[in-house]
Amino acid sequence: MNKKKRVLTGDRPTGKLHLGHWVGSIKNRLELQNSPEYDCFFIIADLHTLTTKIRKEEVLDVDNHIYEVLADWLSVGIDPTKSIIYLQSAIPEIYELHLLFSMLISINRVMGIPSLKDMARNASIEEGSLSYGLIGYPILQSADILLAKAQFVPVGKDNEAHVELTRDIARNFNRLYGQVFPEPEVLQGELTSLVGIDGQGKMSKSANNAIYLSDSDATITEKVRKMYTDPNRIRATTPGRVEGNPLFIYHDIFNPHKDEVEEFKARYRQGCIKDIEVKARLAEELIHFLKPIKERRSEFLSKPLALQNVLEDGTHKMREVAKVTMEEVHDKFGFSHKWRSLLK
């Protein structure tokens, strides 16, 4: 009997992944995937993309972004032989479960989730103009989680409220109809985000402050050269602040030569080293770190049929999991068996 605990996580296909994804989620995903304790489900959440990107040209872009996200995942080590990788929109059971769950939670409860307003603000949507789909985004996310019967969900602090809503929905369903769903728990990694190269909040595509896993060596060097450091350090002889300085945050994470990093910090505090020297070494380490990832990514993108096969295989596996869950839901919910054949 399989005693492994299920974990579900994923990404919206809005473009290429960046170092913030690596620090905040991918590194943790690899540890979970390679642990004997967990079965991992990785969802490419294309339906979630539609909640804030519904224009025709944006929808058409999703297909290309699906391949990019998948190539990024595979290039960093997400393994389809160890994990289930699937496309959200190709799982019809998600739609049904989303609808059922929408009956089990109030609008006020959903609207109380802080990240919902943040999403609207980032998409330049006024609160009074929120679409039904965007309001229902957290419920759709609950359907993703509970369809897989995930017991753990790796999220940052800004998304903990989504998992708590999922727990409420699972609790409500189990109380009303009978035990089907686990109440998932938050699983946090060592780090949940990475500051952007501009020093203004976490790294993100929308903030234009990201270094992408696929950036060229020249682009990486240029982005690091422009990286925000200590604004009060006017010249190299001015003692600089290390704490909270993006330059040293990145060195701590990506430079494996810890003695060198500590030497840089000491000299920086004393005003005995130029920013450009510290930045040059960071660029070298980032280029070295990303080189094998970029090589594998290029190889995967050159074989779109192989990527398609990976996604199809994983989606078929998830369909089997989904069917088992929905059989239990139908039985507990009380749908008549005599009409079940109409669903096939």
Swiss-Prot record:
It comes from the Bacteria. Its main location: cytoplasm. Its EC number is 6.1.1.2. L-tryptophan binds at residue 144. ATP binds at residues 12-14, 20-21, 156-158, 194, 202-206. GO terms for biological process: tryptophanyl-tRNA aminoacylation. It is found in: Cytoplasm. Keywords: Aminoacyl-tRNA synthetase, ATP-binding, Cytoplasm, Ligase, Nucleotide-binding, Protein biosynthesis. It catalyses: tRNA(Trp) + L-tryptophan + ATP = L-tryptophyl-tRNA(Trp) + AMP + diphosphate + H(+). The keyword Ribonucleoprotein does not apply. Homodimer. Catalyzes the attachment of tryptophan to tRNA(Trp). PANTHER family: TRYPTOPHAN--TRNA LIGASE, MITOCHONDRIAL. Belongs to the class-I aminoacyl-tRNA synthetase family. This is Tryptophan--tRNA ligase. The gene is trpS.
